[in-house]
């Protein structure tokens, strides 16, 4: 699902909201999550999951094509850990919000 598909689905399920307002809300949520991660904060959406940042140390790597060793710089990468309700839903269980 793309961001525009998500916006369209939310607007469909909430006919009292204008699609442009839903777009602003979704964009604001994504921006806030990205800003929090950029600050090094953790974002927890209980039941859904938690976004955090993992720091990876610099290391020696190997070019798989040539076998040559190369320096791999330290980096920061986003990380997502699923919440219990989402894991249960994906594994065939029922989630509490299935009563739509």
From Swiss-Prot:
Keywords recorded for this protein, A-Z: DNA recombination, DNA-binding, Transcription, Transcription regulation, Translation regulation
Pfam families given in the database record: Bac_DNA_binding
Transmembrane regions: none
GO MF annotation, one: DNA binding
GO CC terms in record: chromosome; cytosol
Keyword Flavoprotein: no
InterPro entries noted in UniProt: Hist_DNA-bd (IPR000119), Histone-like_DNA-bd_CS (IPR020816), IHF-like_DNA-bd_dom_sf (IPR010992), IHF_beta (IPR005685)
GO BP term, example: regulation of translation
Record carries keyword Transcription: yes
Gene3D superfamilies: IHF-like DNA-binding proteins (4.10.520.10)
Protein family (similarity comment): Belongs to the bacterial histone-like protein family.
Record text on subunit structure and interactions: Heterodimer of an alpha and a beta chain.
Physiological role: This protein is one of the two subunits of integration host factor, a specific DNA-binding protein that functions in genetic recombination as well as in transcriptional and translational control.
Name used for this protein in its record: Integration host factor subunit beta
Species per Swiss-Prot/TrEMBL record: Rhodospirillum rubrum (strain ATCC 11170 / ATH 1.1.1 / DSM 467 / LMG 4362 / NCIMB 8255 / S1)
Organism lineage string: Bacteria, Pseudomonadati, Pseudomonadota, Alphaproteobacteria, Rhodospirillales
Gene name in the database record: ihfB
């Amino acid at each position: 699902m793309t961001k525009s598909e998500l916006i369209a689905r939310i607007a469909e399920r909430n006919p009292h909201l204008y699609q442009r307002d839903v777009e602003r809300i979704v964009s604001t949520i994504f921006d806030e999550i990205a800003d929090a991660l950029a600050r090094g904060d953790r974002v927890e959406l209980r039941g859904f999951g938690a976004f955090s940042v993992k720091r990876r140390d610099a290391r020696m790597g190997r070019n798989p094509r040539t076998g040559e060793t190369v320096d791999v710089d330290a980096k920061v990468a986003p990380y997502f850990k699923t919440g219990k309700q989402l894991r249960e839903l994906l594994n065939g269980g029922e989630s509490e919000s299935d009563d739509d």
